[in-house]
From Swiss-Prot:
It comes from the Bacteria. The gene is nusB. NCBIfam families: nusB. Belongs to the NusB family. This is Transcription antitermination protein NusB.
Amino acid sequence: MASLRHRVRAIALQILFELDATDHPPDQVVGRRLEEEQLPPEGERFLRRLVFGAWEHAAHLDRIIEEAAPNWPVSQMPGVDKAILRIALFEALIDKEEKTPLKAIINEAVELAKQYGSDNSSRFVNGVLGTVVSRYRERSKG
């Protein structure tokens, strides 16, 4: 059985995909999904942090994605891949509450890409995240 955090990331992916494809208000979409999913309090908190964090920082995260994948404009990227990358990059670079190891964040993102994306999604997501992590490490050394 999938862990609570994996399940929450999958729900966050679905919510971000919906938000990106529609003009539905984020509060309403999250509220509806929380009613449907019946998550424990820690899962609900994690879901809200992932969704609202990735959504609020989307423009910044999209610039990071485009730097790492210049041949793939975010506007033309499959919605599932974009949502997965936004979640993973939010967790890795912005979220200060969780201390999830980078390797775990990348592994979770790749698993979500295998589960919800196209045949090439997992390689693409892994490549983008690997590029971002190596650039981030280079900048922090300099």
